[in-house]
Structure formats: C-alpha cells, structure tokens
A protein has these predicted regions:
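Positively charged n-region of N-terminal signal peptides that target proteins for export
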Residues: 1-4
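Bacterial N-terminal signal peptides
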Residues: 6-18
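Eukaryotic scaffold repeat domains enriched in small/polar residues
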Residues: 18, 22-332
C-alpha cells in the first residue's frame, strides 16, 4: 500500500500527455576472444534532451510497441520518453522519491511497462494507460537471515532481495531475477501469485552469482545473465536447466531481437557480444572507456532489430544509439 501511494506521482505523470540434461555451448569463452569485430557507429545526436535535464546513472532502456524509447536513470528525472526519431516527449516522475534504486524497465507484449526497483525490493506493472495494476514483492521487506556471520536471503512468498530484471511470457507468467541477495529466479502467475523459484548462490549449473538480466525467446526458453559467473544460463519455463554459455567478461545485460530468426546481444564491461540461440558468438564490438564510441558497464541494452542497439552506460551517465554497419564502413 505504501508503494502504491508513493508511486501516485509517477502513475499520474506516466501517460498524461547436453550432458545428463546439462549442455555447454562449446568453448564460448575462447570463441568470444576470436569472434569477429562487428563494425558500428553511433548516432551521437539521436537523443534530443532539453537543456535542463541531465541523466544520472544510466540503468535501463526499453521500447514499447510504438517504437518509443524509455530511458531509466537514477537522477531527478528518472524516466525519459523519446519518439522513434529521438525527439524528446516527456520526463516522468520528476523529483519523486519513488525509487530507492531504479534498476530495470521492460515492456511486455501487451505494452504493460514493468519497473524494477532493487532498493525497494519490488517489481511494479503499469498498464498502457499508466495505472499501477500489479506490484510484486514487499517494499523494503527483504527476507534475510544470518549464518556464520554472513547475511543471506530467505526466498519467501512475494519477497525479493534486490531484484534486477523481469520478463513476461505469452501466458502472462512473470519471471524475476532476484538478484543481488537471493541469487534465484522467481516465477509468478498472471495474477501475481508466486508459482515457484529456482537457484541459489554458487557456480554450478542452475546456481547463480548475481543473476542480473533475463530474456525469453520465441520458444519460451529463458536466458539468464549470471553476471559474476561470466555466463548465460538457459532454462525452460519450469526452471529446468538446459545450457550454459561461458563468456570472457561479466554478463551485465541482455536483449533479444524480435522476428523468426532471433539473436541475443549481451552487454558486458566495454563490450557487447552478439550470439545466436545456440550460444555461438557471432561477433563483438566496443572497448572500455567513457568517450563517445566507447562503453563502460553496460547496465541495460535494447535491440528492436539486428542492426540497432540502445545502450545504457551506467557510470558515464550516457545512453547510446548504436548502428551496426555493413562491412564497407570502418568501426570506431
């Protein structure tokens, strides 16, 4: 109830104007190192921000069905909406204290917007008219216990411990990576009831060390970015482990392209990987830095098609539109 009251200003602003069942994707780590460098350039003037708005930590980016781009940051203007041509539409939630640690923004197939607040331990669903229609988790109420002097989280019904991301399946089931504390994936019904959860902290298949991002393909396979383990794990919708893809860097963020032939882009530190759905690294681009054309910790990534990638650079407070080029253009 407290969350709904606190979120009122945002609500009003939003829309007013295989081995024994296990499989590893070859030697993805070494394959990533030898993968081709993808050529790209930035559309450096794409996002047309007003002079009085400066984003802070860039943590989320997502597109709705109209092609509008939503940028989530931890500043005084937490949610920024842009038209498909990059023109500024509005700033949402200005000056509010609704977020304790804004972490992710996603849209589902029905154009509902899902906002993940790691600090408040909640995931909130807004319908296409901007009304809060569902809240998962309990605001500021993580499940925690101590063992041998170490703080650990107790996975409990409708309780998160610093959740990180979410994806919604075609049946309305919601999957939440839960996250910094619980190291698990939680599945909820369309109605918001906890169905099951899987995973705990570790490095074995099915375990996680900071599950930080999650996406789903057309066949309802779930891909989880297991950040501190430098890998992607693949599950079915019941949590059955299917594959693990090892990479050579932290797996911060993911997006998956629409259409019949899908690819996954994985954001790391200074680098983006492009993978097919078998875990093959098709190419990489980027290098570490804070200048335009370089990237830092890629906290979020969005890919409306295979040639266009939007990137949230957390620590340089910058959002980029990246265009992947044909072979004749030289990369940055």
């Amino acid at each position: 109830m407290k969350y709904v009251v606190a979120a009122a200003s945002l609500m009003l602003a939003l829309f007013v104007v295989p081995i024994s069942g296990q499989s590893r994707a070859g030697h993805a780590e070494s394959a990533a190192a030898s993968a081709p460098q993808l050529k790209f350039h930035l559309d450096e003037e794409f996002f047309k921000l007003p002079d009085n708005i400066w984003p802070s930590e860039a943590v989320g980016v997502a597109l709705n069905s109209k092609g509008h781009i939503f940028l989530l940051n931890r500043g005084n203007h937490p949610l920024l909406e842009f038209a498909p041509d990059g023109s500024f539409i509005r700033s949402i939630g200005d000056g509010s204290t609704i977020f304790h640690a804004a972490h992710s923004v996603r849209f589902d197939a029905e154009d509902n917007m899902w906002l993940v607040d790691a600090g408040n331990n909640v995931v909130v669903k807004f319908n296409s008219k901007g009304r809060i229609v569902q809240a998962l988790g309990r605001r500021l109420e993580p499940w925690v216990y101590m063992t041998h002097g170490i703080e650990r989280a107790i996975p409990g019904p409708a309780a998160f411990y610093q959740p990180t991301d979410t994806v919604v399946g075609p049946d309305g089931s919601t999957y939440v990576t839960d996250g910094y504390g619980n190291s698990r994936v939680a599945k909820f019904s369309r109605e918001g009831n906890l169905v099951k959860y899987w995973g705990d902290r570790g490095s074995r298949p099915g375990q996680f060390n900071t599950p930080h991002s999650i996406v789903m393909d057309r066949n309802q396979n779930l891909y989880v970015a297991d950040r501190q383990n430098n890998r992607i794990q693949v599950f079915d919708t019941d949590g059955k482990f299917k594959q693990v893809w090892d990479l050579d860097g932290l797996t911060w963020s993911m997006c998956i392209t629409p259409g019949p032939t899908q690819v996954i882009f994985v954001g790391s530190v200074g680098k983006v990987y492009k993978l097919d759905l078998n875990g093959k690294v098709l190419g990489t681009f980027g290098k570490l830095g804070r200048l335009p054309g370089w990237f830092d910790s890629i906290h979020a990534i969005a890919c409306p098609d295979e040639k266009t990638v939007y990137i949230a650079n957390e620590f340089s407070y910058r959002f980029d539109k990246v265009i992947l080029d044909d072979a004749e253009r030289s990369s940055r």
